[in-house]
Swiss-Prot record:
<feature type="disulfide bond">
    <location>
        <begin position="160"/>
        <end position="203"/>
    </location>
</feature>
<keyword id="KW-0865">Zymogen</keyword>
<keyword id="KW-1015">Disulfide bond</keyword>
<feature type="active site">
    <location>
        <position position="289"/>
    </location>
</feature>
<dbReference type="Pfam" id="PF08246">
    <property type="entry name" value="Inhibitor_I29"/>
</dbReference>
<feature type="propeptide" description="Activation peptide">
    <location>
        <begin position="17"/>
        <end position="105"/>
    </location>
</feature>
<keyword id="KW-0378">Hydrolase</keyword>
<dbReference type="InterPro" id="IPR000668">
    <property type="entry name" value="Peptidase_C1A_C"/>
</dbReference>
<comment type="similarity">
    <text>Belongs to the peptidase C1 family.</text>
</comment>
<feature type="signal peptide">
    <location>
        <begin position="1"/>
        <end position="16"/>
    </location>
</feature>
<keyword id="KW-0645">Protease</keyword>
<dbReference type="InterPro" id="IPR025660">
    <property type="entry name" value="Pept_his_AS"/>
</dbReference>
<dbReference type="InterPro" id="IPR013201">
    <property type="entry name" value="Prot_inhib_I29"/>
</dbReference>
<keyword id="KW-0788">Thiol protease</keyword>
<keyword id="KW-0732">Signal</keyword>
<feature type="disulfide bond">
    <location>
        <begin position="126"/>
        <end position="170"/>
    </location>
</feature>
<dbReference type="GO" id="GO:0006508">
    <property type="term" value="P:proteolysis"/>
</dbReference>
Amino acid sequence: MKVVALFLFGLALAAANPSWEEFKGKFGRKYVDLEEERYRLNVFLDNLQYIEEFNKKYERGEVTYNLAINQFSDMTNEKFNAVMKGYKKGPRPAAVFTSTDAAPESTEVDWRTKGAVTPVKDQGQCGSCWAFSTTGGIEGQHFLKTGRLVSLSEQQLVDCAGGSYYNQGCNGGWVERAIMYVRDNGGVDTESSYPYEARDNTCRFNSNTIGATCTGYVGIAQGSESALKTATRDIGPISVAIDASHRSFQSYYTGVYYEPSCSSSQLDHAVLAVGYGSEGGQDFWLVKNSWATSWGESGYIKMARNRNNNCGIATDACYPTV
């Protein structure tokens, strides 16, 4: 009788929630049993209601971005924050980029169009954002120096950049310390030779398959969006850290993201600033995330610029030297 009841419950789920069935199909969701599915459905419906109510504000012109169902829509915000972040604040560098010189003003910069940015990647349910931000910065600088865009191994950083560098694999890490590891190690392997696994594993670095090297890093003047803009324009893609803890970030879809309750000091996620511009009168930073192309604007987010360092985007920014 219990089996029949559960079967009927499953049929009822499918009939009553076509958006749920679409979500499961699109993202390949299979749950252990119907009890877990019922729980995930309730989470999904709660997120769906939040998204629909938020998007009404967007339609009324009260906010500058909208939300959508994505691969995180069956996660509570607490679960999302527990598994999808991983940034730890690193040491302040000896070298600091402070230039805000009067070079010809650029209203828009997009390093993707210049070939300095690899395709969007996916960290999975592993707190390795720090590794993706690190490789993104090195990939960009390596391209600008050599003319060759090489996708680099985040898995090597997850597996090998612990120990005296204090990174903790899928439990988080520091961009600056990861860069120091690459410098001291003599390089980082290519993605193709050391592919990503979204889990902690033993170190398998191979000096014969190094894709890029670096000599150190330079920090951006803390909290200065002006210095960050100049660095993004003149240097290339910049590793940045942000507060990505809010439900609005979890479900971001398109538009210029401004979150009034964002912190400029409590940062939990490392990403890559690859440009800047304006949209509908709103200045933004163009930011590459590591949550696959199904999140945001094909894996990117436009984050508010010149809004008092919203979400801390200029609080802890740096780039590698190569």
